[in-house]
Design a protein with these regions (language model features):
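Extended interaction regions within the primary functional domain
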Residues: 54-57, 65, 76-77
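Bacterial N-terminal signal peptides
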Residues: 9-21
């Protein structure tokens, strides 16, 4: 069986595309980058095109599934492997490797990742078992063992990444074997910027072979590598802060062992699926429509009106339930109502089709935690659920880029260099400053950058010698150069920043309604009162104590043990290197938000929740 040929862009071209966009961004911030030189006649289109992080999944199961059971077994899998080796998927290959102190991957890269080495040899008899503890119990660290019947299992997962094929494995947890689970590498930047040999995120299909198989009730595991989060606690803290207010994925820590070798501690995050829906809305028994909005710095899935062509929505919103025409029509209707309804009519029009209160909590969490992967910055990396009554619910998905202060990074040997770990500095990509004029509706949108283009350095900072920008989370001035900074980034991020960005209709349109804006600001202050060291500190201390030995011994980690200890310390200092700690973030951010007064003095008192 032959597959349709795919052209595979070499790794050096992907790196070159990144640097090409960085070079462009320095000089022409308001225009899209010029076309990348296409020496390959198949068309190397940069990281956002074929072969990049947002490339569509390559469907090959149907080509080799001779017994039509929906997966590849035995000789079917062997045949698919042989074909992929001859005709590789464009997303195959390890993460990017840094050059001389340069690229995003490997020692010497911008994050100064520690050198990797083989982990300790561990067997199931060496670890504690927790058979009665819930799957996401934060007081224990389970060990998850995988046995993969190939010596170079990383190369095997790389080969099948970007396809609909899972690599079969035997999983052992709490002394119980689970045969025939499926593995694949997951993530975009957490995969493409991490080299082979370092920790990469995994998705585990527990029911890959046996549809009835469950691990403590779960059919899927998401094991994350904590890319971009040296504290390792962002997902757990976001989940804990969000849980009293909206449906949010649970998270805890696990140790992963592959073919007898420890790969260190991972963050296990609950899957958004029918089981998640049934747990939070038991009356619907898991029914309804579900969408995932994949991560994309282009920020083009903000629930704004994209017209009448359903293809414009299908390219931005990934349906996870059965694709039905009526669900797409309802999603398009929601976008139409959000975008085109006058502010004075919007709440009444949305009431039957949107969980408004949940959406306001979602938006408040996004800003209070300074989520640099959030809706306010990128209009992506979130989930949508439409219940059987036709009401849409907006839910968090990616929680690992929150709770970051700006200013100098931890630095020091093995740590991030100073200037790292900045909070958002200027509006999100495509956004405008507060004083910038409204965009011309008849003018083509400008300032969009392809997926995986890199941010410009903060004003006054030069590019490093190797062409990579200083580390930071959306560092630098507004892309269009206009507008005041509205309180800067990090702990002084204005909760009303960017409300003139029509591409993020859920935010800009909801918060244009005075009564809804007032309710949103009340939620912001509620979260600020809850986000304190007295409330969250004991939990941080518990988790720090629990995983510190694992982090110290982890030979595949993406950041240093010293950074982990610094960021999770109980030190009350809010200056110098200690300013990067979670405690300092809570102190400074909560103080700013509790003292915050909106510039618009006409904000009406909040109405009672409907």
């Amino acid at each position: 069986m032959k597959l349709t040929p795919y052209r595979c862009a070499p790794a050096f071209l992907l790196t070159a595309a990144l640097l090409h966009n960085v070079t462009w961004a320095q000089g022409v911030p308001n225009e899209p980058p010029p076309p990348f030189p296409q020496d390959d006649p198949g068309g190397m289109r940069g990281p956002g095109g074929p072969g990049g992080p947002q490339a569509p999944e390559r469907k090959i199961v149907k080509d080799f599934d001779e017994n039509e059971n929906g997966r590849l077994d035995g000789n079917e899998f062997i045949a698919a492997r042989a074909e992929l080796k001859n005709n590789p998927s464009p997303t195959r290959g390890g993460g990017m490797r840094g050059g001389r102190g340069g690229g995003p991957g490997g020692p010497g890269g911008p994050e100064n990742r520690p050198a990797t080495s083989a982990g300790a040899k561990i067997s199931p008899s060496d670890v504690a078992n927790y058979p009665t503890a819930p799957l996401y119990d934060t007081s224990v660290v389970r060990t998850v063992f995988f046995k993969i019947d190939v010596a170079d299992w990383e190369a095997e997962l790389e080969l099948f990444r970007g396809t609909d094929v899972d690599v079969p494995a035997t999983m052992t947890v709490d002394g119980v074997e689970y045969p025939g689970v499926g593995l694949h590498f997951r993530g975009a930047s957490s995969y493409f910027t991490v080299p082979k040999g370092s920790k990469r995120s995994l998705n585990v299909s527990v029911d890959h072979t046996d549809s009835a198989l469950r691990l403590h009730g779960a059919t899927t595991l998401n094991l994350l590598n904590s890319s971009g989060d040296p504290s390792m606690l962002s997902s757990l803290l976001y989940s804990r802060l969000a849980a009293p207010h909206i449906a949010a994925p649970k998270a805890n820590f696990v140790q992963v062992v592959v073919n007898g070798e420890s790969w260190g501690v991972f963050i296990s995050v609950e899957q958004f699926n029918k089981l998640f829906v049934a747990a939070h809305w038991p009356q619907f028994k898991g029914e309804g429509a579900r969408w995932k909005v994949p991560g994309s710095p282009q920020g083009s899935a903000g629930l704004d009106d994209k017209g009448d062509d359903v293809a414009a929505y299908k390219s931005r919103y990934e349906i996870k339930s059965k694709s039905r025409d009526e669900d797409w029509k309802d999603l398009m209707h929601l976008c139409d109502v959000l975008t085109n309804t006058p502010a004075e009519e919007l709440e009444a029009k949305l009431q039957p089709i949107l969980d408004i209160e949940g959406a306001l909590w979602f938006l408040a969490l996004d800003m209070v935690t300074c989520n640099s992967d959030g809706f306010w910055t990128r209009a992506s990396d979130y989930s949508i659920y439409k219940d059987p009554t036709g009401v849409f619910h907006i839910l968090p998905h990616d929680m690992n880029e929150s709770f970051k202060n700006h200013g100098g990074g931890p630095g020091g040997p093995g740590g991030r260099r100073g200037g790292g770990m900045r909070g958002p500095q200027g509006p999100p990509p495509n956004g405008q400053g507060a004083d910038a004029p409204p965009p011309d509706a008849n003018r083509p949108r400008r300032g969009t950058q392809p997926e995986f283009s890199l941010p410009r350095p903060p004003q006054g900072e030069a590019m490093p010698p190797d062409g990579m920008p200083p580390m930071g989370d959306f560092g630098g001035p507004p892309p269009n150069g206009g507008g005041r900074p509205m309180g800067g980034g990090g702990t002084t991020l204005d909760p009303l920043r960017g409300l003139d960005d029509g591409s993020k209709a859920l935010r800009s349109k909801l918060l244009a309604v005075p009564s809804l804006r007032a309710r949103y600001l009340e939620h912001v202050k509620t979260l600020a009162r809850e986000m304190t060291w007295s409330n969250l500190g004991p939990f941080i201390t518990q988790e720090r104590t629990l995983i510190a030995p694992f982090v110290e011994q982890d030979t595949r980690k993406l950041s240093t043990y010293e950074d982990f200890m610094l960021l999770t310390a109980a030190d009350e200092a809010t200056t110098g290197r200690a300013a990067q700690s979670l405690r300092a973030f809570f102190t400074l951010r909560s103080k700013y938000l509790l003292e915050y007064k909106p510039a618009n003095a006409t904000t009406k008192p909040a109405t009672k929740n409907p």
